[in-house]
Regions:
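Glycine- and acidic-residue-biased ligand/ion/polar-headgroup-sensing regions
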Residues: 63-81
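A cytosolic small-molecule/anion-sensing beta-strand core signal
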Residues: 71-72, 88, 106
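Short acidic-glycine-tyrosine-enriched beta hairpin
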Residues: 79-99
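A short, N-terminal "cap"/entry segment at the start of jelly-roll beta-barrel domains
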Residues: 1-48, 128-131, 139-149
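A generic "binding-loop/recognition-motif" signal
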Residues: 55, 63-64, 82, 98, ...
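Double-stranded beta-helix
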Residues: 105-149
Length: 149
């Protein structure tokens, strides 16, 4: 496992930097639909996402603690401590308020694991993440109509 920590990042402005990246991407990048698998079991929700190489994804703000796992591949990911390059497998413990940007240097598979009360993808989206009216993804990582315009 290889981990490289970025230097010169302040904890507070990281979410602002990720939001600025999302705003810039919305104007200049064509979104892709992500191969996403959803599993519910015993009050837990697991989301597994395949990220093709040279792809950058900006997620929504998470409301609850959860695990974020890089199963395979190499990604550069933003955390509260800054940007870091990780080759999977690697496990992060994410706090409420986390908003990540993830750049896949290689094909990568990442997953999140959450404790939930919900039993559907639509319900879990409402339970786990803040509403983002600018997001081009519907629950389950399906592209919305605005992504295609």
């Amino acid at each position: 496992m290889q981990v490289t920590y970025g230097k010169g990042f302040d904890v507070a402005p990281m979410s602002n930097r990720v939001q600025a990246l999302q705003d810039a991407m919305f104007a200049h990048v064509t979104p892709i639909e992500l191969d996403t698998k959803h599993r519910f079991h015993g009050g837990m929700y697991l989301r597994e996402v395949f990220r093709p190489a040279d792809c950058i994804i900006v997620g929504k703000v998470h409301k609850k603690e959860h695990f974020y796992i890089v199963l395979s591949g190499t990604v550069v990911i933003t955390t509260d401590e800054g940007a870091m390059e990780v080759t999977g497998p690697h496990i992060f413990e994410s706090k409420p308020g986390a908003k990540r940007a993830v750049y896949a240097k290689t094909d990568a598979v990442c997953m999140t694991i959450h404790r939930v009360d919900s039993t559907t993808v639509e319900e879990v989206e409402e339970e786990l993440v803040e509403n983002d009216p600018d997001c081009v993804y519907l629950p389950g990582n399906k592209l919305s109509g605005k992504a295609l315009t």
